[in-house]
Amino acid sequence: MAVPRNRHSNARKNIRRSHHAKKARHAAVCNNCKQAFIPHTICTSCGFYNGKAVMTVEKK
């Protein structure tokens, strides 16, 4: 099995892991109700997806 020859310092480890952070998700705007929602999902405020009513949403 492969074993590292030398120890990696904490700084070197953190530099390598600098790209592992979570990225913020982008928001799209619903064409029906103009609310922000996550792309490729049903709009949670009106229930539309791709211009079609997919589910009914109860108004509060």
Swiss-Prot record:
Region (Disordered): 1-23
Domain of life: Bacteria
SUPFAM superfamilies to which the protein is assigned, alphabetical: Zn-binding ribosomal proteins (SSF57829)
The keyword Ribonucleoprotein is assigned to this record: yes
Organism: Chlamydia caviae (strain ATCC VR-813 / DSM 19441 / 03DC25 / GPIC) (Chlamydophila caviae)
Matches recorded under InterPro entries: Ribosomal_bL32 (IPR002677), Ribosomal_bL32_bact (IPR044957), Ribosomal_zn-bd (IPR011332)
UniProt keywords, alphabetically: Ribonucleoprotein, Ribosomal protein
NCBIfam families: rpmF_bact
Annotated S-S bridges: none
GO biological process, one term: translation
One GO MF term: structural constituent of ribosome
HAMAP family documented for this protein: Ribosomal_bL32
Family: Belongs to the bacterial ribosomal protein bL32 family.
Name of the protein in question: Large ribosomal subunit protein bL32
GO CC aspect terms: large ribosomal subunit
